[in-house]
C-alpha cells in the first residue's frame, strides 16, 4: 500500500551526523538505507502494510499486465469484494496524485490481499502463488522493495529513499534486534530490480560507509 510520502533525513543512526546522498551507478540512495535496520515481522504486524494507506501499491505500467495474467491463478484466494472491484475497474487505477496503483477495497485493502483463516494474518496473494510455484511472477517491485521507495528523476536517475511508516515499528525493532540493515533485508528485490553487479557495488559502498561510522 502507498502511505503518505516522506523524504527521510540523511542522518546516521550511529553517530547522529548527517551523511551525503550516495550513488551506485544510475541510482541515488539515502544513506539510511545502509545505516538503519529493518526486518518484517508478520506475527507482530499481521501484514498491515497491505491494508493501511491512502491508495494502492505503486505500479509500473508493465506490471498491470503481469497482475492481469496472474489473476486466474489467484482469483480464488481473493475476497468477493476484491473480485467485484476488479470486475468493475480492473486490477489498477490512477490515484489522486495521478500515480498508477493497485485497486483497493473500501479505501483500504489491496485487491490482491488474502487472509490466513487461522491467524488472520494478511498476505499478498500473488506472492503466495509465486512461492507455491503456481505463477512465474512474484509481486509489484514497489511492494518487494518496501520500506524503500523508488522515484525516477527527470535526469534519468532513480532515487531510493527509506520510507518510515508507523505501522512498521515492529519491523524496525526486529531489524535492530537482528542487526539487519535495510539494504541486506532487501537483497533479493534490490538484485531483482537493479542486477547482481549493482548490488555487489552497493555492498562495497556499504562496507566503506559503515566502516567510517565506527
Ranges and model annotations:
Residues 1-214:
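Short loop/turn segments that flank or connect secondary-structure elements
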Amino acid at each position: 500500500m502507498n502511505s503518505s510520502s516522506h523524504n527521510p533525513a540523511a542522518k546516521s543512526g550511529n553517530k547522529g551526523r548527517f551523511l551525503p546522498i550516495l550513488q551506485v551507478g544510475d541510482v541515488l540512495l539515502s544513506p539510511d538505507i545502509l545505516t538503519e535496520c529493518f526486518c518484517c515481522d508478520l506475527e507482530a504486524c499481521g501484514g498491515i502494510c497491505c491494508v493501511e494507506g491512502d491508495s494502492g501499491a505503486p505500479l509500473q505500467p508493465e506490471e498491470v499486465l503481469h497482475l492481469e495474467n496472474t489473476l486466474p491463478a489467484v482469483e480464488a484466494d481473493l475476497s468477493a469484494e476484491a473480485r467485484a472491484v476488479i470486475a468493475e475497474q480492473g486490477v489498477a487505477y490512477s490515484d489522486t496524485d495521478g500515480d498508477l496503483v493497485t485497486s483497493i477495497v473500501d479505501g483500504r485493502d489491496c485487491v490482491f490481499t488474502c487472509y490466513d483463516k487461522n491467524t488472520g494474518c494478511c498476505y499478498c496473494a500473488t506472492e503466495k502463488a509465486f512461492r507455491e510455484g503456481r505463477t512465474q511472477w512474484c509481486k509489484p517491485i514497489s511492494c518487494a522493495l518496501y520500506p524503500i521507495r523508488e522515484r525516477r528523476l527527470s535526469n534519468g536517475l532513480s532515487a531510493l529513499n527509506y520510507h518510515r511508516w508507523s505501522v512498521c515499528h515492529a519491523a524496525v525493532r526486529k531489524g535492530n534486534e537482528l542487526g539487519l540493515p535495510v539494504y541486506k533485508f532487501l537483497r533479493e528485490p534490490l538484485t531483482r530490480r537493479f542486477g547482481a553487479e549493482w548490488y555487489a557495488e552497493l555492498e562495497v559502498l556499504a562496507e566503506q560507509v559503515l566502516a567510517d561510522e565506527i
